[in-house]
Amino acid sequence: MKSMLKTLLWVPALALTWSCAQISPQHATGSLGGTSWQLVKFQGGDDRVLIPDDKAKYTIAFGTDGQVSARIDCNRGRGGWRSEGRNQLQFGPLALTRAMCPPGSLHDHIVRQWAFVRSYVIKNDHLFLSLMADGGIFEFEPLPAK
């Protein structure tokens, strides 16, 4: 009876250990701090897809101190970010330079949507930022190593 009880206690412990080992440290902590990304596309809630002409013009870097820096086409900005729960994300106001970007730029669209980001998920090494009320999803990939 005692050996059966020990076995029953060890099986869940081993299962928990194995499942935790399958999650990378970044996913386990839920932290975006120290990561940098470039925009792949935006998929709107209405299935509209917007693809940047140059991914390198649309980047975001999450600092470990809760600061975020962004390049949004011809402008650069800084602001704050926080994640108060698993996969939750919220940006504070973004202080941006005010250059006029060329026609066809995704600048205005991204700036309008910035405050509506509410959650994120990292899947297949891509970062997906979801807007509130199914407004759309931004898909980012890691910045290439320099």
Task: Write out the residue ranges for each language-model feature.
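Lipid interaction determinants
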Residues: 5, 9, 18-146
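Short, linear, compositionally biased motifs with a strong N-terminal bias
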Residues: 14-15
